[in-house]
């Protein structure tokens, strides 16, 4: 299939987990009605974003939140990229994205590889490592449309991850993410366009909607970028669904016109995965 429809759900996340789950599933159903074949929720879709919240909202996978995603994926017969939730496993907490196929099967589980530990004086200090542990594996899955690579938020800053996904045949990279009012205006779109052009792939980011009263205010602006670096669709800050038709013929044309993969100087440099 040369073209398929992608939907990004920019969810307004509250402190009430059950409400977040109900609204998320309702918006997934709405995206399905609009013809979406792959849908992504935002980072931390069932919980406020913050290290003080992660322990209280954490679940095992499978668990209540992921069970509901499995059920709605099967009901709508679509691929559901479950944003991320705080996951607890073997005494540790992770920021984890679970992906479900059209039959409700868990296809892959991506644990955020790069923890968001930053300090921008006078603006924002945040230490995910206060409560979270990093993942240690690459995460990709196949659909009838294309191969999809996964990252979560801060993972997008590390170009090597996107390069490895491109090497492994991914044509779409999806990053559920929650940039903030400092990093968002500076880098959110820039990073997406950079990853898309460098690797000649589609890049999509799904953010929570902005809540000015939250302890961590998300940037919003869920976005889809094509391999030419053009923004195909972009949300504002409110709760909404963003749609984009992903044209793989366009991707093939760009790779033919500017054949960077065959022109790489592997005699001089390489990016190598140290784990499978």
UniProtKB/Swiss-Prot annotation:
It is found in: Cytoplasm. GO terms for cellular component: cytoplasm. Residues 4-248 form the CN hydrolase domain. InterPro entries: C-N_Hydrolase, C-N_Hydrolase_sf, Nit1/2_C-N_Hydrolase. Its EC number is 3.5.1.3. The modification N6-succinyllysine is found at residues 68, 123. It catalyses: 2-oxoglutaramate + H2O = 2-oxoglutarate + NH4(+); 2-oxosuccinamate + H2O = oxaloacetate + NH4(+). The active site is at residues 43, 112, 153. GO terms for molecular function: 2-oxoglutaramate amidase activity; omega-amidase activity. The modification N6-acetyllysine is found at residue 68. GO terms for biological process: asparagine metabolic process; glutamine metabolic process; oxaloacetate metabolic process. Keywords: Acetylation, Cytoplasm, Hydrolase. Transmembrane segments: none annotated. Homodimer. Belongs to the carbon-nitrogen hydrolase superfamily. NIT1/NIT2 family. Has omega-amidase activity. The role of omega-amidase is to remove potentially toxic intermediates by converting 2-oxoglutaramate and 2-oxosuccinamate to biologically useful 2-oxoglutarate and oxaloacetate, respectively. This is Omega-amidase NIT2. It comes from Bos taurus. The gene is NIT2.
């Amino acid at each position: 299939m040369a073209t398929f429809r992608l939907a990004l759900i920019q969810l307004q996340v509250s402190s009430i987990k059950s409400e977040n789950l109900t609204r998320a599933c309702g918006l997934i159903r709405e995206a399905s009605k609009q013809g979406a074949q792959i849908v992504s929720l935002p980072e931390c879709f069932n919980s406020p974003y913050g290290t003080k919240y992660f322990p209280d909202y954490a679940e095992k996978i499978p668990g209540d939140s992921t069970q509901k995603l499995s059920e709605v994926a099967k009901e709508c017969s679509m691929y559901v990229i479950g944003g991320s939730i705080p996951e607890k496993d073997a005494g540790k907490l992770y920021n984890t994205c679970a992906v479900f196929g059209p039959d409700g099967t868990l296809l892959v589980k991506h644990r955020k590889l790069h923890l968001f530990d930053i300090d921008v004086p006078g603006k924002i200090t945040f230490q995910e490592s206060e409560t979270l542990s990093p993942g240690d594996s690459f995460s990709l899955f196949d659909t009838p449309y294309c191969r999809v690579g996964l990252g979560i938020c801060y993972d997008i800053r590390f170009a090597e991850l996107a390069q490895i996904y491109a090497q492994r045949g991914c044509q779409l990279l999806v990053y559920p993410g929650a940039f903030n009012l400092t990093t968002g205006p500076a880098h959110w779109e820039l990073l997406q366009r950079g990853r898309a052009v460098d690797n000649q792939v589609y890049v999509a980011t799904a953010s929570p909607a902005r809540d000015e009263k939250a302890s961590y205010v998300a940037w919003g602006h869920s976005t889809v970028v094509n391999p030419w670096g053009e923004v195909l669709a972009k949300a504002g800050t409110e709760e909404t669904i963003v749609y984009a038709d992903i044209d793989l013929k366009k991707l093939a044309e760009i790779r033919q016109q500017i054949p960077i993969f065959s022109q790489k100087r592997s005699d001089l440099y390489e990016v190598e995965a140290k784990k499978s």
